[in-house]
Regions:
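C-terminal structural segment of proteins
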Residues: 1-192
Length: 192
């Protein structure tokens, strides 16, 4: 979708690129991925960081971060609402093989919210469903690598991680820190 590409760059394309196999990827939908609230969902991780809203038939319009934490029900997802605002968006994931589920998936978004610079961090495949962290950090554009690494460490440490056959909780936290640092560095290098 050109509107999403204009708003988010190549981040959304990156989050759907790894969906297992061409046949499945051509049938998968953004709505189905978000409604399912799957722990391995790249799409949920990306849209959660974009401060997205969902419109439900019975539940009305609520933030995606609230919807993710609701118990599964029989409500119908009508639409997904992404705010159109000037923000920088990055998404990345680590996989053991190209078409495997992610070991960890991270998304970082920054922009002005109510006059304050706000950073949104979403980490999925922890192996729990994606979670969102919001920070009002004013990071200088010329921030040093050490300063960015400290911010990334702090953000990654505020998520809960678990272990399964793809990796331990400690391994996932380390990977999340690395991905968050890379994404923050990329955003700061591009300029806001």
């Amino acid at each position: 979708c050109e509107a999403l590409k204009d708003l988010c760059g190549d981040g959304i394309a990156e989050c759907v690129r790894h969906i297992v196999g061409v046949q499945f990827r051509n049938q998968a939908t953004i709505g189905g991925s978000i409604y399912g609230r799957f722990g391995f969902s790249d799409v949920l991780t990306a849209f959660l960081a974009l401060d997205t809203f969902v419109e439900l038939y019975d539940g009305g319009t609520i933030r995606l971060s609230e919807f993710v934490n609701r118990k599964p029900d029989k409500d119908i997802l009508l639409s997904i609402i992404v705010r159109k605002s000037k923000r920088k968006f990055r998404y990345d994931s680590i996989r053991q093989t190209k078409t495997d589920f992610p070991v960890i998936a991270c998304s970082v978004v920054t922009g002005m919210v109510h006059g304050k610079e706000t950073w949104y961090f979403s980490v999925g495949a922890r192996p729990m469903k994606a979670a969102l962290l919001e920070k009002q950090w004013e990071i200088p554009a010329d921030a040093s690598e050490e300063m960015i690494a400290d911010y990334a460490r702090q953000a990654a440490s505020e998520f809960t991680y678990g272990s399964n056959m793809r990796g331990s909780a400690e391994y996932r936290q380390h990977l999340a820190e690395v991905l968050i640092r890379r994404e923050m560095t990329s955003i700061l290098a591009e300029g806001r």
